[in-house]
Amino acid sequence: MNLLPKSSKEFGSADYWEKFFQQRGKTAFEWYGTYLELCEVLHKYIKPKEKVLVIGCGNSELSEQLYDVGYQDIVNIDISEVVIKQMKERNGSRRPHMSFLKMDMTQLEFPDATFQVVLDKGTLDAVLTDEEEVTLRQVDRMLAEVGRVLQVGGRYLCISLAQAHILKKAVGHFSREGWMVRAHQVASSQDRVSEAEPRFSLPVFAFVMTKFRPVPGSALQIFELCTQEQGKPVRLESADQLAEAVRERQYYAWLCSQLRRKAGLGSVSLDLCSGDTGEPRYTLHVVDNPAVKPSRDNHFAIFIIPQGRETEWLFGMEEGRKQLAASAGFRRLVTVALHRGQRYAGMESIQAELSARVMELAPAGLPPQQQVPFLSVGGDIGVRTVQHQDHSALSGDYVIEDVQGEDRWYFRRLIFLSNRNVVQSEARLLKDTSHRAQKKRKKDRKKQRPADTSEDFPPAPGQSIDKSYLCCEHHKAMVAGLALLRNPELLLETPLTLLVVGLGGGSLPLFVHDHFPKSRIDAVEIDPTMLEVATQWFGFSQSDRMKVHIADGLDYITSLAGEAPPHYDVIMFDVDSKDPTLGMSCPPPAFVDQVFLQKVKSILCHDGVFILNLVCRDVRLKDSVLAGLKAAFPLLYVRRIEGEVNEILFCQLHPEQKLATPELLEMAQVLERTLRKPGQGWDDTYVLSDMLKTVKIV
């Protein structure tokens, strides 16, 4: 039996409702929430002694339940004669002070200012079925009548699904009249709607419109929102902001209902924001792993990503999170990233804060009272220390932060806040041994540290950078590409000339400068702020062999191309694009334009190598870039960085320079033996030949 309208127009039809109640008989229809779901907001805004008008009462038990807890001055009206007769028969003797009248709410038969409260549970939604002129005129009459029969200080309580056209009409009407508008999301309504009434997947809202005395010339408008978790209302600036807040909650309710019904929705992510500031506090990703055979204990888990590690491939990329979910062995894993600028007391505090929210993302089939585990790496939430935050005219807002990585090492990172999930530059910090001596003197203390507390102190702002360590895999590959130069065993004594376009934190040119003592490096950086950052925070410094030119790399190379002879043994491009819409984030397209590549070619020495960091997600665009490079540089190697989008391209001028893989690996080994000299720091995990094992010729 189809008891819900086949089309929205039927909502406004008296004939439809007559047929509806005849079919349903005496069974109450609580499609906008039961009394238990609505009582909190109703009791907040209705006093027991106030006179209440319920418009479009239907056969809902709401009025009866209000009456039974002390709200006895209630008048109910409806356009259906059938339902009014039913309700009179049901309540005549049991609730003698409550009345039921057949009445058109657009023509109320009450004097002005008769009621303190007008209660509407779904009636406005039933009338405002579309935005045609006839419908809007009818709604205008209805809302005008509501305003007429309410006293000053009275409230219109409208229980609604808050569809966009209804929200626009009701909020617009009463805010123009100078009334205060407050919205409450009704607790648990999204759960009831998604499971019991699958056609209605929207959460239920209670709008409280409070009638103020008109003030001539005043344009004051008050909009507030109360969520189900938060009693304190949040003041909003406009009706549009209120509508947007409602839409966000509707989308969240829809998302939760979809996640409850089925798995494999694809990439699902959402931010949970602070109720006090509105700033993002947690970012959640839902990862389904249908390959896992279900058991009682493997349905659902939450993984807290340690602070500062959210940019790692395992946590920051979709494929990485899938691998994490598979290794964890749960059918659904929700990863939780913590935001910089937010304070977290510890793992237990985070669990308490998230418990209710994350359970709304649980999959179907989760056993009742099932304990959901919270997982992490090392059992703690990690360490993140923001050392500096500022603004660059070219790059926007940025932050310098120190984070704790694996094996208790700390890393300093530069992050542009326009792309928070990408580490722009990174360097490892040297461990500060002064603290260790201090701890040794205190070793006899009886009180021990908790097991999950870091034994290394957070780094100080001026702590030294480990210049021998390259954090970025693409930088390691770019340096390994120097093995393509002739006679690698002699490179330390060769006066190499290098051009590096894109400074960032300066780690790449600094490493080359320190390990190739005869090298001379020109670094080109368009943003002067980046030179300040590199110098102050990443241990970078200029010298007679290291010069930084504040210029556009395009202009700098164009100016050199007009000169002769060729200038550089090595040219490196490690420059990012500021336009995220292009499908290629490194380099900007102009740097791989055919005309410009000819200029690059003209300043590269005969046996030199041009090394390019390419980050391109658009397959067609990448193929076009590779074709253009191949046209300019006949010999082209490519090395993909595992777990990243980066591809390092090694370009040379002459096909006869081509090396087979065994030869290339041998030259890399020769170069590494040359670089590993006494007194010169070297990262033992950095093996040059490993960087070139997967190199392919295009």
Curated annotation (Swiss-Prot):
Residues 436-448 have a biased composition (Basic residues). Pfam families: Methyltransf_25 (PF13649), Spermine_synth (PF01564). CDD domains: AdoMet_MTases. Expressed in the inner ear (at protein level). Expression is detected in the cochlear duct, spiral limbus region, efferent and afferent nerves, and in spiral ganglion neurons (at protein level). Its main location: cytoplasm. It catalyses: L-lysyl-[protein] + S-adenosyl-L-methionine = N(6)-methyl-L-lysyl-[protein] + S-adenosyl-L-homocysteine + H(+); N(6)-methyl-L-lysyl-[protein] + S-adenosyl-L-methionine = N(6),N(6)-dimethyl-L-lysyl-[protein] + S-adenosyl-L-homocysteine + H(+); N-terminal glycyl-L-lysyl-L-glutamyl-[protein] + 3 S-adenosyl-L-methionine = N-terminal N,N,N-trimethyl-glycyl-L-lysyl-L-glutamyl-[protein] + 3 S-adenosyl-L-homocysteine + 3 H(+). One of its GO terms (biological process) is methylation. Its EC number is 2.1.1.-. GO terms for cellular component: cytoplasm; cytosol; mitochondrion; nucleus. Residues 431-461 are annotated as: Disordered. The modification Phosphoserine is found at S267. Keywords: Acetylation, Cytoplasm, Methyltransferase, Mitochondrion, Multifunctional enzyme, Nucleus, Phosphoprotein, Transferase. The modification N-acetylmethionine is found at M1. It comes from the Eukaryota. GO terms for molecular function: protein-lysine N-methyltransferase activity. It is found in: Cytoplasm; Nucleus; Mitochondrion. Dual methyltransferase that catalyzes methylation of elongation factor 1-alpha (EEF1A1 and EEF1A2) at two different positions, and is therefore involved in the regulation of mRNA translation. Via its C-terminus, methylates EEF1A1 and EEF1A2 at the N-terminal residue 'Gly-2'. Via its N-terminus dimethylates EEF1A1 and EEF1A2 at residue 'Lys-55'. Has no activity towards core histones H2A, H2B, H3 and H4. Forms a tripartite complex containing GAB1, METTL13 and SPRY2. Within the complex interacts with GAB1 and SPRY2. Belongs to the methyltransferase superfamily. This is eEF1A lysine and N-terminal methyltransferase. It comes from Mus musculus (Mouse). The lineage of its organism: Eukaryota, Metazoa, Chordata, Craniata, Vertebrata.
